[in-house]
């Protein structure tokens, strides 16, 4: 009953995440209890076990490290699942109160320090781009243009895979400043792709208003996109497409992009790199430019806030970002 309501009210990706933890963890550990047995003590003991659970991770040098199996954010997701189920029981008068409300807030373990975000320095960017321009695996995975586009736009991997030719304006839109008027090439970030169990790859328009945005493109990225565009493409075709069963271009799975990255990253000494590293690199380049406000950075990233700025109007273009990023990609 609870998961049915979630599917009706929330995005498929959220429902899929809840279903994963419900089937894989909550039901195996709590499913045999009757509702009247799901008291504060039982639920608290369940979350205590999750907090203490550890996993062994092999490091790059072959050594092993004990790490937390269920991070604080994961446990918060699981708590939302249990709370939702118990709230349904309250609404149907199966129990008198929701025991999850009596639990202490979930915190990270004592002494735990979140690893600092890692972006690509100028030297690492040059090394990576030089390699993917020549490597057969990287070329076959279309990584050369895709990585430049990712670093130059800051899009999430699902957004990268969802960009269509109709979302690009390579001729540019007119932007008026105090000094002049110029044409700024842009990408309109209007959708995202992600896999949903039982449905395959699905498309949605973003979970929040800030996810829908217009991002200026650096000149180097624009030049490479123009070279890809032959003029006969269907506007609804993805820019970084995969071949569909009928031979026509279709959306690429984000997991396939990650797989291509794993095949090349060790070759350039970047074994820790993921597609999200490119987004962090974009954010780092923007953060290094003191002329951009926190509001501008948040707009470009498609986030509610960037650093301290939260309660301001949103949605401007900020064309100067393209200039900073173009210099960083050269």
Question: What do these predicted regions represent?
Answer:
Residues 167-175, 186, 272, 291-311:
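Short, polar N-cap/turn motifs at the start of nucleic acid-interacting alpha helices
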Residues 3-94, 99, 114, 136-141, ...:
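N-terminal core-binding DNA-recognition domain of tyrosine site-specific recombinases/integrases
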Residues 123-126, 143, 191-198, 216-271:
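Active-site/catalytic core of tyrosine-dependent DNA strand-transfer enzymes
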Residues 91, 148, 152-159, 256-263, ...:
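C-terminal catalytic core of tyrosine-transesterase DNA break-rejoin enzymes
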């Amino acid at each position: 009953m609870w998961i049915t309501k979630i599917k009706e009210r929330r995005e498929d990706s959220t429902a899929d995440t809840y279903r994963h933890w419900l089937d894989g963890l909550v039901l195996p550990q709590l499913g045999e209890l009757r509702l009247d047995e799901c008291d504060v003590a039982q639920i608290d003991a369940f979350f205590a076990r999750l907090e203490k659970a550890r996993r062994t991770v092999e490091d790059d040098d072959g050594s092993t490290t004990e790490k937390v199996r269920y991070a604080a954010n994961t446990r918060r997701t699981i708590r939302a699942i249990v709370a939702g189920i118990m709230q349904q029981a309250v609404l149907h008068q199966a129990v008198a109160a929701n025991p999850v409300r009596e639990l202490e807030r979930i915190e990270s373990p004592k002494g735990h320090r979140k690893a600092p975000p890692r972006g690509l320095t100028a030297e690492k960017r040059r090394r990576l781009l030089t390699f993917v321009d020549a490597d057969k695996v990287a070329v076959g995975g279309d990584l050369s243009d895709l990585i430049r586009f990712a670093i130059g736009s800051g899009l999430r991997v699902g957004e990268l895979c969802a960009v269509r030719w109709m979302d690009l304006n390579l001729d540019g839109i007119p932007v008026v400043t105090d000094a002049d008027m110029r044409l700024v090439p842009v990408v309109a970030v209007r959708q995202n792709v992600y896999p949903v169990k039982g449905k395959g790859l699905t498309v949605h328009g973003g979970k929040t208003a800030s996810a829908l945005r217009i991002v200026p493109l650096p000149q180097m990225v624009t030049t490479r996109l123009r070279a890809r565009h032959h003029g006969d493409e269907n506007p609804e075709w993805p820019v970084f497409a995969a071949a569909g069963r009928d031979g026509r271009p279709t959306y690429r799975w984000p997991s396939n992009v990650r797989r291509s990255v794993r095949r090349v990253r060790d070759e350039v000494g970047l074994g820790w790199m993921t597609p999200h590293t490119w987004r962090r690199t974009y954010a780092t380049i923007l953060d290094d430019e003191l002329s951009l406000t926190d509001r501008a950075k948040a707009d470009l990233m498609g986030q509610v806030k960037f650093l301290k700025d939260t309660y301001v109007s949103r949605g401007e273009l900020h064309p100067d970002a393209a200039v900073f990023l173009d210099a960083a990609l050269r």
